[in-house]
């Protein structure tokens, strides 16, 4: 049975050494040509089996490994967002993953998110415990870790420190996340225990061990998955759309099954459904050369077979988006391929709600991953699209916010904000959350939602009529009417400007027009215990329908009293609760209705 290369994805926290480790394997130096030493784009590299056997020759006999796969195809990802982007029907594009962890720093938030994604996609993985060369006293050298891990080559103190860091920074965290894990040479059952392979991207130590473990695991446990369909048409996923000099727009893609030929037709998903275009050229990088930064030009291929990274030149590719499914077929199979791609695109369709927020992402897979994580925290999504944030998105979000402020949010994963959209955001009430880490965006969404809910609750409470009981102070009637002016003491609750006032027998007396403090400054409210002069405009005539020592109440409309009693009671001070309780008892008596306000 012919086997294809297993597709390997590399995940891990920023600066834990993903690209440097791959560079060591490929003997190229991509990282040094990139800004900040951090992977900026997605790429793919083929590592032929002969290369693996060459660098691992000392280990093949030790592990009794008989490798028959043609090699491995490594997707070099910027963190793990690309892993979620690269999907095929049934889950992740990658057959197996390498999770890179700095053995000295241990697990970081992105490490945990990467593991959660791997669990969700049911993708087997190996842990590369990188930067073993930085363990104090460790004598790191190029070659197999297993041959260097002994007291002949290492000081006992360095061996002890290695064991401590291996357990404390790697194995313990894996255990806490529900995985059995151990140093790869101690693993007895690879179906139940995660292999941890110590490596150094600087010296090359452990790279042979890692290649043997990855190749052996893939061949042993994924044989059925790696069976090559030697007669079927090519199936793949778009990595990214690129402008190439002399070729125009091209697609970088991973082919995971079947065979493709020059002159075949490309059938690929796009926002409108399916695009069909005749292939002009299938271009491949040379072996051990990284797809996004080759030192030599691509070479044209008449035929390619899975698994491989390929650059596709064809007309009219502008609307293609990363993460889209693709097929490469002869003319007589175009219609069947269109149906297949359409079905796969529809699987990516995200169910939306009648109301909610807007989410945008750079690829179909990452949009799906973002939506899934937001659903876990009960977020409602009105619109989910691939692409940059436009002015139209902002206007739509603003209209959603007009009915519910919680809907005035756009979450952008790894996309640009167009200039006119930025200008629109500045003059609108729309909130924009941007980022390249899904879990952080979800956390920020939860924090923003909580803040907004508290603000909305506070606004609503402030709009409600606050309960209060006041007493007209003796010898403090300054004007009888139009408006009446007198001194009052707030017995319970909060007296505010505009509060409607009633007597103990339920008669409407007017509303609070003005209040002053001891310095004769106008104030907007008076709280329990305060004695203040007030003016009351309305039917009140002091000395006639309201007298010294009379108790007056703020008249709270029944719907507002009910809201305060049921929804906002915990937000009221103790004296405000007492004012509300006494007022409701009084109204129940006056209205002869024990359910008033309940």
Curated annotation (Swiss-Prot):
Q: Could you say which protein family the record assigns here?
A: Belongs to the TRAFAC class translation factor GTPase superfamily. Classic translation factor GTPase family. IF-2 subfamily.
Q: Gene3D superfamilies from the entry?
A: P-loop containing nucleotide triphosphate hydrolases (3.40.50.300), Translation factors (2.40.30.10), Translation initiation factor IF- 2, domain 3 (3.40.50.10050)
Record domain tr-type G: where: 3-225
Say yes or no: keyword Endoplasmic reticulum present. no
**Which residue stretches belong to region G2?**
37-41
Q: Which purpose does this protein serve, as stated in its record?
A: Function in general translation initiation by promoting the binding of the formylmethionine-tRNA to ribosomes. Seems to function along with eIF-2.
Q: Which GO terms describe its cellular component?
A: cytoplasm
Query: What Pfam families would the database entry show?
Result: GTP_EFTU, GTP_EFTU_D4, IF-2
Please list the residues that bind GTP: 12-19, 76-80, 130-133
- Which protein are we looking at? Probable translation initiation factor IF-2
Region listing for G5, in residue ranges: 200-202
Where in this protein does the record put region G1? 12-19
Recite the UniProt keywords alphabetically: GTP-binding, Initiation factor, Nucleotide-binding, Protein biosynthesis
A molecular function GO annotation: GTPase activity
Q: Which residues lie within the region annotated G3?
A: 76-79
Q: Which InterPro entries match?
A: EFTU-type, P-loop_NTPase, Small_GTP-bd, T_Tr_GTP-bd_dom, TF_aIF-2_arc, TIF_IF2, TIF_IF2_dom3, TIF_IF2_dom3_sf
Region ranges (G4): 130-133
